[in-house]
Amino acid sequence: YSSHPIQYPPMKIADLELGDKPLFLAPMEDVTDPSFRSMCKEFGADVVYTEFISSDGLIRDAAKSLKKLEITEAERPVGIQIYGHLIEPMAEAARMAEAAGPDIIDINFGCPMKKIAGRGAGSGMMRDVPLMVEMTRRIVQAVDHTPVTVKTRLGWDDENKNIEEIALRLQDVGIAALTIHGRTRAQIYRGEADWTLIGRVKNNPATDE
């Protein structure tokens, strides 16, 4: 045991300097609207995110989806999170998100809810890793300069914990950062998170710091 605090290097996402141990407000549907984000910034959040936004809603110009793109200068740094199950709508949604001026565009490959994952979006994408990787590659190519990040899980279930493979393949197509929920889709939000597996991903020499 040491009384000295652990020293962490300052965190960066692409060229975005976030300092030592930044506090992130996760994107949450029906929670992280502009008022809530503003309040969390006031109380110390370093990075905030919009609610996740449907790519189908954006390309159809659905008012509810377009409303979620609205961000303010006071929120920065701020990320916009998108989700969907088809490559072309996701690439177009990423372009629309970039036009709103966020600091980060995040792809949701982690939502376990049946109405999302059951259609192949969110964590449902973990059942088709080649599609997940190709979608991510196309999104990275679709935007001009905004860093693209991904949120995902350990795998679909205990027999398919493939996050180590996924992390390397997503890194290879150009993501700037990866957030891992330490459970499988089958667990949803139940049971223990597997911090050991997250640590293996982080400490893999093939994975950039």
Model-derived regions, located:
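Serine residues within intrinsically disordered or low-complexity segments
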Residues: 2-3
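Flavin-dependent oxidoreductase catalytic cores
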Residues: 7-209
